[in-house]
Amino acid sequence: MSKEKFERTKPHVNVGTIGHIDHGKTTLTAAITRVLSTKGQASFTDFSDIDKAPEEKERGITIATAHVEYETVNRHYAHVDCPGHADYIKNMITGAAQMDGAILVVAATDGAMPQTREHILLARQVGVPAMVVFLNKCDMVDDDELIELVEMELRELLDDYEFPGDDVPFIHGSALLALENPEDEDKAACIWELMDQIDSYIPEPERDVDQPFLMPVEDVFSISGRGTVATGRVERGIIKVGEEVAIVGVRDTVKTTCTGVEMFRKLLDEGRAGDNIGALLRGVKREDIERGQVLAKPGTITPHTKFKAECYILGKDEGGRHTPFFNGYRPQFYFRTTDVTGIVTLPEGIEMVMPGDNVAVEAELITPIAMDAGLRFAIREGGRTVGAGVISEIIA
């Protein structure tokens, strides 16, 4: 059967495998591509190709990530798998590979392990909306009661981290047996069941263009006789000529009207998510708006200075700091287009943070920035990236 081209008409969903080392994340990733390739819904990617994932740079941080793609009858999936535990942490915190849903892989022979917990917690902190669980290596456990026990324990663990433990789908199987016998109905059944569950349980993401308008301001010009133009890339939503926009962050929020949208020196009726535009703003002076602010649909985003965040601090070998930092550390936080100084408060019982650690912190900025939970940032010292983070909660 000839391999058909992927249908780009299907809804696109980003997923990824998470879980403890050696529980079978990469084997499962390979098995999905192998089993689906029997129906032309994927091209098979070998375990070793996934395992020696290429390195990518995201926000100044090097991360090894493997990408595969496949499709079901209903959807097109992009799937990420990381070779090392540190890569997972970096990936989830930087959002290098945004996940609309996760496949948590747990070996039935071991049950929940430290990295299982850490990945579930991180998924919660960085806002992964849903996950399904693949109980792997079930062929190596003779006692069904033992498998049930592992499942019960995991459902409780999911509850602890505010995932709906009772509702999360669990699929029992063996990724290795499916990988080796993709045509065998019994052995490959767990993969087809997994596909059905991610299709039905992981919600379809809201497309950027359907979300409320937001554009980080990158530059500001005044055009004599016409007014002030703010330029930037529309992050989400649509801005139409004549609509009201708010200028948010750094100083008091101001409302104005967008009287024109241009792109590549042409006038348009609207700017959409992904477009690099100039927005002409009525009655706004050149000095009233600056880089670091955002244009947004009024009432959809507010400026804040205090937040909780999950951070990864670069190791020395990654070009990060050579020494630990302590409570009261004052780096710059790079949000969207600009650096803002902030003060870091470490959690109780943590004296210092070593290069290469990940840590949950509280931070207070010296100027307010438009933000909501899920916003990512780089941590910098004098223009050099020393870490990355994602806001888990707004405090004030």
From Swiss-Prot:
GO-annotated cellular components: cytosol
Matching Pfam families, A to Z? GTP_EFTU (PF00009), GTP_EFTU_D2 (PF03144), GTP_EFTU_D3 (PF03143)
Tell me which residues bind GTP: 19-26, 81-85, 136-139
User: Which stretches of sequence are listed as region G2?
Assistant: 60-64
Detail which positions bind Mg(2+): T26
Q: What is its EC number?
A: 3.6.5.3
Is Lyase given among the entry's keywords? no
Localization terms from the record: Cytoplasm
Where mainly found?
cytoplasm
Q: Where is this region: G4?
A: 136-139
In UniProt terms, what function does this protein have?
A: GTP hydrolase that promotes the GTP-dependent binding of aminoacyl-tRNA to the A-site of ribosomes during protein biosynthesis.
Q: Which family does it belong to?
A: Belongs to the TRAFAC class translation factor GTPase superfamily. Classic translation factor GTPase family. EF-Tu/EF-1A subfamily.
Instruction: Please describe the quaternary structure of this protein.
Output: Monomer.
PANTHER family to which the protein is assigned, alphabetical = ELONGATION FACTOR TU, MITOCHONDRIAL, ELONGATION FACTOR TU-RELATED
Q: What's this protein's name?
A: Elongation factor Tu 1
Query: Organism, per UniProt?
Result: Desulfotalea psychrophila (strain LSv54 / DSM 12343)
Task: Provide the gene name from the record.
Answer: tuf1
